[in-house]
Amino acid sequence: MKATELKDKSVEELNTELLNLLREQFNLRMQASTGQLEKTDQIRKVRRSIARVKTILTQKAAA
């Protein structure tokens, strides 16, 4: 998801998105540790999406 799309969302929606991403990150880590994950770049994409959401949340809190 792009940062411009995230800026339009409310804080509650961003928190929900963050929880979903954290769950997805956990699942991907488990798949990677058991050798089931074929597309290892997904972990990096999810990690960066988490960073985007946290950045937008911080910006909204400061505003």
Curated annotation (Swiss-Prot):
This is Large ribosomal subunit protein uL29. GO terms for cellular component: cytosolic large ribosomal subunit. NCBIfam families: L29 (TIGR00012). It holds the Pfam family Ribosomal_L29. It comes from the Bacteria. Belongs to the universal ribosomal protein uL29 family. One of its GO terms (biological process) is translation. It comes from Pseudoalteromonas atlantica (strain T6c / ATCC BAA-1087). Transmembrane segments: none annotated. The gene is rpmC. SUPFAM superfamilies: Ribosomal protein L29 (L29p). One of its GO terms (molecular function) is structural constituent of ribosome. InterPro entries: Ribosomal_protein_uL29, Ribosomal_uL29, Ribosomal_uL29_sf. Keywords: Ribonucleoprotein, Ribosomal protein.
